[in-house]
Amino acid sequence: MPPYRSRTTTHGRNMAGARGLWRATGMKDGDFGKPIIAVANSFTQFVPGHVHLKDLGQLVAREIEAAGGVAKEFNTIAVDDGIAMGHDGMLYSLPSREIIADSVEYMVNAHCADAIVCISNCDKITPGMLMASLRLNIPVVFVSGGPMEAGKVLLGGKTKALDLVDAMVAAADDKVSEADVAAIERSACPTCGSCSGMFTANSMNCLTEALGLALPGNGSMLATHGDRKRLFVEAGHLIVDLARRYYEQDDSSVLPRSIASFAAFENAMTLDISMGGSTNTVLHLLAAAHEGEIDFTMADIDRLSRRVPVLCKVAPAVADVHVEDVHRAGGVMAILGELERAGLIHGDLPVVHAPSLKEALERWDLRRTSSESVTEFFRAAPGGVPTQVAFSQNARWKETDVDRAGGVIRDVEHAFSKDGGLAVLYGNLAEDGAIVKTAGVDASILVFSGPARVFESQDAAVEAILANQIKPGDVLVIRYEGPRGGPGMQEMLYPTSYLKSKGLGKACALITDGRFSGGTSGLSIGHVSPEAAEGGLIGLVEEGDSIQIDIPNRRLHLDISDEALAHRRTAMAEKGKGAWKPAHRTRKVSTALRAYAAMATSAARGAVRDVDQLFH
C-alpha cells in the first residue's frame, strides 16, 4: 500500500520544523495524517475565463475539509490569448503552458501533496494542468470555470448571437459602421467564462470529460449558472475519496495514468473530431500523452480522423450555435453517447465519477437517462445579464434538445458530415503532418490550389491583407512562426479574421508552421511540420509557387521539381548562420522565449520541451 506522500513532511521527530510551518498555515494536531489536497487555482483579473475563480478555490477547500482532508490552495498563471493576440504578446501563450505544468509540479512535489483539484478554464491552463497531472500521477479531479454566455446584439432590427471573433471580423470590415462595430464590441463577451464558441478553452474542458478526469457538464455548463457550483462542491468530496482509495486501499485505478490511458486518449480525440474542436487540442493532447508516457501520435489522430463523423457544429463552424446550446442538447455526455452507440469509443474505461464510462452514460446521456435531476441539469440556460460573478443566475430552457436528426447534436445516421471535423495532411510540404479544422472549411474549397504568397511573419501577412494585396485564389504562407522559429508558435486568428472581413474566407487558403485560434475557420492549415526553422520545406517556398491542397485525400503539396528543390536547399545552406531564419524580420526575443525555443520540439510532438536537444 503506498504511503501518503504528505507524511514525508508531517510525520517523524525530524519533521518538527516542517510541522511547525504547517501549523502556521492553520493545521491542528488532528490534521496530521489526513490527506493533503492541493487546490491548483488559476484566478487572474486579466482573463474573463478566470476573473470569477477567486473564491472558488476556497469553496473547493471547504468541501475537501468537510470530507476529511486538508486543503491547501495555490495559484498559477493564466494568459488571455485574445488579449495577447495580434502582437508579440502571443509569443508567450504556448510557452506559458509549460510554465503552468512546471508550477503545478513544483508546488505539489515541493510540499508532498497527496492529490490535486485543478481549477482551470482557458486555452493553456487546462493543458498545462493536464500535463502536470500526468507527470505527477497522483489522484486528480479537474473542474473548470465554465463557458461564457454567447453575446447578443440587435443589428438591422434582428437579434444576432455573437462572440469574440465577430468583433474582430466586424472591426476589419470597412462596410460595417463605427456604431455597429461599437455595438458588437460591447456585446461580444457579456459575462465571465471562457469564450462562448467551441474554441480551444471549451474544447479542452470538454476533452477532460472524455479523458475521464472531470465531472459531467465540466465542458458545457455556463460559468454564470448556479448549477455549476455543484461541480466544485462534488470535486472537493470526490478528490478525498480518490485519495483514500489509492493510499488506504491500494487502488491504483484512480490514478491519472490509469484513467487517461491510450484508449482514453482515443476517446478524447474521437470526441474532438466529432465536434470540430480547436486544432490546438491536437498539440495539447500530444503534449499530455508525452507527459503520461503514452505512445499517442499524429498517426493515431490521422487514423481516427478517417472514421469519425461530425456530430456537432458550433461557432466558429456555424454562426448561431454556441456551447450553451451544446449543453442544452446534453453536452459532452450526449456526444459520447452517440459515439458509443456507433461503436466509435471505448465504453469500458474508468472515469473519476463512475466505474466505467458506459455506466456514466447510462445516467448522464439524455437519451438514456430516467433521472429528472439530470434533465434539469441540462436545461440550465443563459441568464442574459452581463456579469463577472460565478453562479449568479438560474435560468432554464423550457426543454432540452434531444432532436438527434436536426438538432445541435446529431446521431451518426444524421451526421453533419461522414468525415471528421479535423484532418491530418501529409505531403512534401508537411512530411511530419499538418492539421486543418475541416468542420470550418466550406465544401467548395476542400480541394484547392493556387500561387503562394510568402510572409516571414504574421504581421507582414496582416499588413498585406488589410492593404488589399491578397487576391482570390492565393495561398498565404506564413512561416518562421513555429515553436522554435517564432518562437512560441503564434496563433493566426487576425489573418483569418481579416480574410473573412475582406470577403476572402472561402476564396483563399492559409498555410503556416504556426497555429490557429480555436476561433479560426476557413481553409487554414497549421502545425506544418517540420517547421521552417527546423529545415522544413515550408522555408523554401517562393512567391508564386503552386501549392495543392487536397483535404479528402489528406495531401499538402508544393509543386516543385527535385532539381529545383535541391538548388534551393543548396542556396539556403550557403547562407551559413543566416540559414533557416526569417529574412528582414525584426523581432525582440527575450531570454525566457529563447530558453523555450532552445528546447521546443516540433508541433508533431506537441511542441513539448526536449532537454536533450540542448546537448546535440
Swiss-Prot record:
Query: Which reactions appear under catalytic activity for this entry?
Result: (2R)-2,3-dihydroxy-3-methylbutanoate = 3-methyl-2-oxobutanoate + H2O; (2R,3R)-2,3-dihydroxy-3-methylpentanoate = (S)-3-methyl-2-oxopentanoate + H2O
Which BP terms in the Gene Ontology apply to this protein?
Answer: isoleucine biosynthetic process; L-valine biosynthetic process
Entry GO MF terms:
2 iron, 2 sulfur cluster binding; dihydroxy-acid dehydratase activity; magnesium ion binding
The protein's Enzyme Commission number: 4.2.1.9
Q: Name one Pfam family in it.
A: ILVD_EDD_N
Magnesium: present as a keyword of the record?
Answer: yes
**Which residues are listed for Mg(2+) binding in this entry?**
D81, D123, K124, E491
Q: Which SUPFAM superfamilies match?
A: IlvD/EDD N-terminal domain-like, LeuD/IlvD-like
GO cellular component term, pick one = cytosol
Chain's role: Functions in the biosynthesis of branched-chain amino acids. Catalyzes the dehydration of (2R,3R)-2,3-dihydroxy-3-methylpentanoate (2,3-dihydroxy-3-methylvalerate) into 2-oxo-3-methylpentanoate (2-oxo-3-methylvalerate) and of (2R)-2,3-dihydroxy-3-methylbutanoate (2,3-dihydroxyisovalerate) into 2-oxo-3-methylbutanoate (2-oxoisovalerate), the penultimate precursor to L-isoleucine and L-valine, respectively.
Which proteins does it associate with, and in what oligomeric form?
Homodimer.
What is the name listed in the Swiss-Prot or TrEMBL entry for this protein? Dihydroxy-acid dehydratase
User: What is the species listed in this Swiss-Prot or TrEMBL entry?
Assistant: Methylocella silvestris (strain DSM 15510 / CIP 108128 / LMG 27833 / NCIMB 13906 / BL2)
- The gene name reads ilvD
